[in-house]
Amino acid sequence: MAVYVKFKVPEEIQKELLDAVAKAQKIKKGANEVTKAVERGIAKLVIIAEDVKPEEVVAHLPYLCEEKGIPYAYVASKQDLGKAAGLEVAASSVAIINEGDAEELKVLIEKVNVLKQ
């Protein structure tokens, strides 16, 4: 497990996270865009891939999210995350800005918060 991964997310919830990314009306893709969204406080949920190399690219994101009070979670594959974000390449991280279905995202965030404890 990568240094920056603070908790394990079950495959079922990882699939829900990828579905939420695919359904979201507005997202930010990549470590730089996600970092800006978190710093500005506009991210509703941050999803980070576990297989990012070098790890330093996204290692700051969990700490930044905790500092700003923004929920975050992990998915196993940057390829899957990129595909869910509508890219043909991998994505190290994605921030959901406008969720589309707010109630569905709220339930997903609650599941993620339970995992963190």
From Swiss-Prot:
Record GO biological process: box C/D snoRNP assembly; ribosome biogenesis; translation; tRNA 5'-leader removal
GO annotations of cellular component type: box C/D methylation guide snoRNP complex; cytoplasm; ribosome
Highest taxon of the lineage: Archaea
Keyword Nuclease appears in the UniProt entry: no
Gene3D superfamilies registered for this protein in UniProt: 3.30.1330.30
Subcellular location: Cytoplasm
Pfam families: Ribosomal_L7Ae
Gene Ontology MF annotations: box C/D sno(s)RNA binding; ribonuclease P activity; rRNA binding; structural constituent of ribosome
Keywords from the named record: Cytoplasm, Ribonucleoprotein, Ribosomal protein, RNA-binding, rRNA-binding, tRNA processing
SUPFAM superfamilies (UniProt xref): L30e-like
Record carries keyword Cell inner membrane: no
Assembly description: Part of the 50S ribosomal subunit. Probably part of the RNase P complex.
Purpose: Multifunctional RNA-binding protein that recognizes the K-turn motif in ribosomal RNA, the RNA component of RNase P, box H/ACA, box C/D and box C'/D' sRNAs.
Family to which this protein belongs: Belongs to the eukaryotic ribosomal protein eL8 family.
Protein name (Swiss-Prot/TrEMBL): Large ribosomal subunit protein eL8
Gene: rpl7ae
